[in-house]
Swiss-Prot record:
Residues 47-116 are annotated as: Transcriptional repression and interaction with NCOR1 and SIN3A. Residues 8-18 have a biased composition (Acidic residues). SMART domains: HLH (SM00353), ORANGE (SM00511). Residues 122-157 form the Orange domain. Residues 1-52, 307-337 are annotated as: Disordered. This is Hairy/enhancer-of-split related with YRPW motif protein 2. The gene is HEY2. The keyword Protease does not apply. It comes from Homo sapiens. The lineage of its organism: Eukaryota, Metazoa, Chordata, Craniata, Vertebrata.
Length: 337
């Protein structure tokens, strides 16, 4: 007869049976079976089994932690909050559930789009930079929340963030509703000068000479030179004052930044699509801009002040240099807005 050992575990492959002999055997055989039960070999097997169980448990915990780390990195809400405080496992799982519900509500097209995901992470990074700027002003510069310089700077950065998000949303909707076809690059730049020059109050007759022709009017080989001329003319028209009045030669920040960032982003996307569909060489006249370069151009345009603002702020910077104060160029620029 076989009787199972008392030291059993939940693992079925580790179960063992020990032969204790028949009932009609003499007592010496049962004594030997008890000795076998308490032998060093059985003790070592039990210890090895416990060690294997600990290793398996550690691997299971490591898999759970790695999966939670991936969820914290992939879910935008959890990624935004991971710098401020340590997230618990329950919070990460709850954010993941909310994110999946949002994807289900939008038909599964939300963050599976690479462009939408990139723009979302860019806006999150801009908000994080805004938080760090506010912390720097309070801890290093010693400016409290009621200081007018800090209020203007934080308000300006918040406005820029809102405008960038609105421009990104507009360009994303235009990208989904109007897919690029082989001749879409000329149509994308067709209305660029008019969109840039209308806020300055110029007439339609002044903006028509710099209008781009379509592909039927101009050969594709000269398209790059025309695009470069268009950007140069638009930039000069934005910065040159009108002859009639000295007042507002530059559009407000809310309109110029929104229109310029949207048009530059659309221009970069159209030029990238044209590079894949046309056997042209743009190396000589028009450099190819990836989407991240377009975002950098929009950011540089938002940071750089207009010509009139720089001219008025230069005496203030000279006077501040004579007083041995720290050089803060953004102080006067933000005040102009």
């Amino acid at each position: 007869m076989k009787r199972p050992c008392e030291e059993t575990t939940s693992e079925s492959d580790m179960d063992e049976t020990i032969d204790v002999g028949s009932e009609n055997n003499y007592s010496g055989q049962s004594t030997s079976s008890v000795i076998r039960l308490n032998s060093p070999t059985t003790t070592s097997q039990i210890m090895a089994r416990k060690k294997r169980r600990g290793i398996i448990e550690k691997r299971r915990r490591d898999r759970i932690n790695n999966s939670l780390s991936e969820l914290r990195r992939l879910v935008p809400t959890a990624f935004e909050k991971q710098g401020s405080a340590k997230l618990e496992k329950a919070e990460i799982l709850q954010m993941t559930v909310d994110h999946l519900k949002m994807l289900q509500a939008t038909g599964g097209k939300g963050y599976f789009d690479a462009h939408a995901l990139a723009m979302d992470f860019m806006s999150i990074g801009f908000r994080e930079c805004l938080t760090e700027v506010a912390r720097y002003l309070s801890s290093v510069e010693g400016l409290d929340s009621s200081d007018p310089l800090r209020v203007r700077l934080v308000s300006h950065l918040s406005t820029c963030a809102t405008q960038r998000e609105a421009a990104a949303m507009t360009s994303s909707m235009a990208h989904h509703h109007h897919p690029l076809h082989p001749h879409h690059w000329a149509a994308a730049f067709h209305h660029l000068p008019a969109a840039l020059l209308q806020p300055n109050g110029l007439h339609a007759s002044e903006s028509t000479p710099c209008r781009l022709s379509t592909t039927s009017e101009v050969p594709p080989a000269h398209g790059s030179a025309l695009l470069t001329a268009t950007f140069a003319h638009a930039d000069s028209a934005l910065r040159m004052p009108s002859t009639g009045s000295v007042a507002p030669c530059v559009p407000p920040l809310s309109t110029s930044l929104l229109s310029l960032s949207a048009t530059v982003h659309a221009a970069a996307a159209a030029a990238t699509a044209a590079a894949h569909s046309f056997p042209l060489s743009f190396a000589g006249a028009f450099p190819m801009l990836p989407p991240n370069a377009a975002a950098a151009v929009a950011a540089a345009t938002a940071i750089s002040p207009p010509l009139s603002v720089s001219a008025t702020s230069s005496p203030q910077q000279t006077s501040s240099g004579t007083n041995n104060k720290p050089y803060r160029p953004w102080g006067t620029e933000v005040g102009a807005f």
